[in-house]
């Protein structure tokens, strides 16, 4: 490989966004919602998680001492057994989890996760408190 070509590849590896992990940023970090009201959680990806006509974004609920539970897969599909109060939407880089109406049992931490690119990555979590 010529020196110029090698140098170009090295520089490309250093350009932010040209390679590396997809970063998922959730907001808010925490929220308190009154019983019966709507909770909305956002997840923004540092690059698109869409491929082959699907959005490879998923949502999980985790309660203390328990493993994460899958709620929504491929952005908007409700996992079997999950109440229809939970819904997901979005595409490319912007996604939303909605819980409407909120019930007392929904108090938990919620995570978005992408598996469009390796390594699979998770958002930082949103802690939901029910008032």
Swiss-Prot record:
GO biological process: adaptive immune response; immune response
Cleaved signal peptide residues: 1-20
Residue span of region Framework-3: 81-112
InterPro entries according to UniProt: Ig-like_dom, Ig-like_dom_sf, Ig-like_fold, Ig_sub, Ig_V-set, IgV_Light_Chain
Keyword Acyltransferase included in the entry's annotation: no
GO cellular component assignments: immunoglobulin complex
Location of region: Framework-4: 122-131
Region (Framework-2): 59-73
Disulphide-bonded residues: 43-112
Pfam families hit by this protein: V-set
Keywords tagged on the record: Adaptive immunity, Disulfide bond, Immunity, Immunoglobulin, Signal
Matching PROSITE patterns: IG_LIKE
Residue ranges of the region described as Complementarity-determining-3: 113-121
Keyword Hydrolase: no
Region (Framework-1): 21-43
Region described as Complementarity-determining-2: 74-80
Complementarity-determining-1: annotated span: 44-58
Domain of life: Eukaryota
Protein name: Ig kappa chain V-III region MOPC 63
Record organism: Mus musculus
Lineage of producing organism: Eukaryota, Metazoa, Chordata, Craniata, Vertebrata
């Amino acid at each position: 490989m010529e020196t110029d070509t090698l140098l170009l590849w090295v520089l490309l590896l250093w350009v932010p966004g040209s390679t590396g992990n997809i970063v998922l940023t959730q907001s808010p970090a925490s929220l308190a919602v009154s019983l019966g009201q709507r909770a909305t959680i956002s997840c923004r990806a540092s690059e698109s998680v869409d491929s082959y006509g699907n959005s490879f974004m998923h949502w999980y609920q985790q309660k203390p001492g328990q493993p994460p539970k899958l709620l929504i897969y491929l952005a908007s599909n409700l996992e079997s057994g999950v109440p229809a109060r939970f819904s997901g939407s979005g595409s490319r880089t912007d996604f939303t989890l909605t819980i409407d109406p909120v019930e007392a049992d929904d108090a938990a931490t919620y995570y978005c996760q992408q598996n469009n690119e390796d390594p699979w990555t998770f958002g930082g979590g949103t802690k939901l408190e029910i008032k």
